[in-house]
Amino acid sequence: MHYARIVSNLHLGYDIIHMAEYVTLTTNRKAFHNYFLEEKYEAGIMLLGTEIKSLRSGRVNMGDAYVKPQRGELWLVNAHISAYECSGHTSHEPMRERKLLMHRKEIALLMSKVKEKGLTLIPVRIYLKNDIAKVELSLGRGKKLYDKRDTITKRDTERELEREVKYRNFRR
């Protein structure tokens, strides 16, 4: 996905369209199934060189990942970034905790919201924004089993309706 933003350039007398690239590397599909996601936030992530190379090749799994607030900092836990094949003997630990980078006021706000009953901070996706790795975080409330069943039945009925509409339009 590309989003364009116009940057005013007065000394040249015209506007330049600056393309900000957003390349999604991975999404946490389990998060959409297990949680009601509410607010979204963007955080940077501290990675080693071999980790960013593994990310770019798509060797990451965020199925059980969550964010742990600890001593005024946010840490990404249980995100598996596979070892880079070409790194030789100097590779990283795949399941290590990774520090998330945000402003202190944002961290304090998130920590106060996480202390509320039932809210968890969940990584939804990892993406590149102008070649810098970012994590999209979301506040989520856990779904009960009947909530999961309701969302599945709603999705199935919507899919059936779309199929019928498509079939009707095709027959005309």
Curated annotation (Swiss-Prot):
Coiled coil: none annotated. It is found in: Cytoplasm. It holds the Pfam family SmpB. Disulfide bonds: none annotated. One of its GO terms (biological process) is trans-translation. Its main location: cytoplasm. Required for rescue of stalled ribosomes mediated by trans-translation. Binds to transfer-messenger RNA (tmRNA), required for stable association of tmRNA with ribosomes. tmRNA and SmpB together mimic tRNA shape, replacing the anticodon stem-loop with SmpB. tmRNA is encoded by the ssrA gene; the 2 termini fold to resemble tRNA(Ala) and it encodes a 'tag peptide', a short internal open reading frame. During trans-translation Ala-aminoacylated tmRNA acts like a tRNA, entering the A-site of stalled ribosomes, displacing the stalled mRNA. Belongs to the SmpB family. This is SsrA-binding protein. It comes from Dehalococcoides mccartyi (strain ATCC BAA-2266 / KCTC 15142 / 195). The lineage of its organism: Bacteria, Bacillati, Chloroflexota, Dehalococcoidia, Dehalococcoidales.
